[in-house]
């Protein structure tokens, strides 16, 4: 495969990921969550969405797949550890950290269907 083809595929995947994260964020807002950050980057990794509902901080991994099971299975143990490490850094910077509970969710974004939210997925 030529470099141009690989670059085009990467760009397409990035666009799909960005759109999926936006769709997931809107979906979560409709469910009453306040979105605090999209694509939050730390030195330990990236968190797709950081949301809050009351005293609950939710760290969300978004996966665009054709099915729910494929989306959930796509979040590897290594990815879970990376997200947890990044969330620890984010939490350490919050003034009300002691009050906050935390949860790790997955939102599956599938073509032609509403997103599916998996609370407390890992």
UniProtKB/Swiss-Prot annotation:
InterPro entries: Restrct_endonuc-II-like, tRNA_endonuc-like_dom_sf, UPF0102_YraN-like. It holds the Pfam family UPF0102. SUPFAM superfamilies: Restriction endonuclease-like. GO terms for molecular function: nucleic acid binding. Belongs to the UPF0102 family. This is UPF0102 protein Rleg2_4331. It comes from Rhizobium leguminosarum bv. trifolii (strain WSM2304). The lineage of its organism: Bacteria, Pseudomonadati, Pseudomonadota, Alphaproteobacteria, Hyphomicrobiales.
């Amino acid at each position: 495969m030529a470099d141009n083809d690989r670059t085009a595929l990467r760009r397409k995947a990035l666009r799909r990921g960005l759109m999926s994260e936006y769709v997931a964020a809107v979906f979560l807002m409709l469910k009453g969550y306040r979105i605090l950050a999209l694509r939050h980057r730390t030195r330990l990794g990236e968190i797709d969405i950081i949301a809050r509902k009351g005293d609950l901080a939710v760290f969300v991994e978004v996966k665009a797949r054709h099915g729910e099971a494929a989306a959930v299975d796509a979040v590897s143990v290594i990815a879970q550890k990376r997200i947890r490490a990044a969330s620890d850094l984010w939490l350490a910077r919050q003034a009300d950290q002691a009050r906050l509970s935390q949860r790790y969710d997955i939102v599956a974004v599938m073509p032609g269907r509403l997103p599916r939210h998996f609370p407390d997925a890992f």
